[in-house]
Amino acid sequence: METKVLNKMRSDWNDRAKENAQYYVQNATKEWDQREFFRSGEINVANDVLPDMGTICGGQRSPLDLRALEVGCGVGRMTRMLARIFGHVTGVDISEEMIGQAKRNTADLPNVDLVLGDGCTLAGLADSGYDYAFSFIVFQHIPSYEVILSYCREVFRVLRPGSLFKFQVQGGTGMQTNELDTWLGCSFSPERALELARNSGFELEHQAGAGTQYFWLWFRKPGIATP
């Protein structure tokens, strides 16, 4: 894997977390009120996770019986709300600083565990151990297609058959990026998104927002979800 890119990602996100983690996680404002910051995460979960609960649960299972994975959890902005929905939530992030703050922000939640990742794998997480995976405003910052592909393959590995991975990528066109730009990541067209699904083992079930910053992808791991 691209060591230079991964090292730059970790270094940059540690620096951003030290400077102003809340702003770099959700840059609507530089002066977040703590309550409003986490409220913004609740709104994102309500808008981008709850509408899929029928297909996540398969119409039979309770979300309290499910294990969810958040790739790029940051300081736990959305993790807190996810933990109110699912029985267990694992958050992964490349930044030690972000994970440290996330641990403080979720210390009251016994069904959350947080893992410092290497930026491209989910090392230490068991095969077929999760029922749902989610990522928002994370992959849009990754400058390397190969790193994103590695993450998708790892999510495929840790999901149970039939499970959903919903995530957002940069879909804007005409942007100039380079391999060490950890803010403006690589962009995806619908064709490239389909290639990503196929190369990581998933089926591309749905997509929305092509050509915009918020290009959402619904990747399904083939198989039947079991109760």
Predicted regions: what they are:
Residues 1-69, 75-86, 90-122, 145-146, ...:
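Class I (Rossmann-like) S-adenosyl-L-methionine-dependent methyltransferase catalytic domain
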Residues 132-146:
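A short SAM/SAH-binding and catalytic strip from SAM-dependent methyltransferases
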Residues 123-133:
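A short acidic, Gly/Pro-enriched loop at the edge of an enzyme's catalytic core
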Residues 149-161:
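A short glycine-rich, Lys/Arg-flanked "PGG" loop and its adjoining helix->strand segment in the class I
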